[in-house]
Swiss-Prot record:
Disruption phenotype: Blocks the synthesis of tropolone class of fungal maleic anhydrides downstream of stipitacetal.
Catalytic residue positions: S147, Y181, K185
Stated name of the protein: Short-chain dehydrogenase/reductase tropE
Residues reported in the UniProt entry to bind NADP(+): L18, D69, N96, Y181, K185, T216
InterPro entries found in the cross-reference section: Fungal_SecMetab_SDRs, NAD(P)-bd_dom_sf, SDR_fam
GO molecular function: oxidoreductase activity
GO cellular component terms, A-Z: cytoplasm
Keyword check for Cytoplasm: no
Enzyme class: oxidoreductase
Short name of one Pfam family: adh_short
Similarity annotation: Belongs to the short-chain dehydrogenases/reductases (SDR) family.
This protein's pathway: Secondary metabolite biosynthesis
Amino acid sequence: MVLSDKKFVLVTGGSSGLGFETIKALIQTNQPYHVFLGCLFPDEGQSAVLSLQRDVPETPSTLESILVDVTDDESIDRCFHTVQSKIGHLDVLVNNAGISLQASEIGMREAWNRCYDVNVTGAQIMTHTFVPLLLRSNDPRLIFITSGLSSLTPMSNVYTPTRMTVPAGWPKPEVHPYRAYRATKTALNMVMLEWHWQLREDGVKTWGVSPGFLATNLGASFAGMDGAPPVLPASVGGRLVASVVEGDRDTDVGKIVLKDGEVQPF
């Protein structure tokens, strides 16, 4: 099968966690894909490709690691030109790369700025850069990985996810380690909506995907805390993202999709 017979997908942060499981879910389907596995370092990208090939030895799809640091405009440009020179278009962009940092580890300003740089600005610039390739697809799809922690509706009624009452006094106890992370994901939801409306008339389908609380490096710091939701295998989130790529959630364009056909409130 030649490359032109396949759908072309780029997943940022594809060498581990949800990105890795999304790619695995895609190459387990009957639809032939050529997946660009976005990674920060050549060795980690190649290792992830080999691991996926071992896990899914029989597949109509092909894999290729590609270097992309979403905090580096030159890296994003190099990634774009590599994809452009090889195939000339892109069918699916999955903005998956994300981090969660704590002020207690590196200082508040550094933690918040770096989280916004990766989780919001990085996704914005990746999308802006790759739109010309998406517009050359017959069925362009744009996905932003968000979080249940980003939802304003439940947070306006109760302190989610712990549901605890924070006692008076200062300093406050550590309730959860995700303040910067959740704020960036709320911002990312607006980025998703902006692109949904900007690209709708061009035929680009855009979603936010909220994969649930997964057993990944991102989830490790919250697992077991009071009020923490049950931990799901990362493969559950990967299958959800893959289902959006496959067209199962086309009726929910412009929304934040959850598993089991549900939609997350903004």
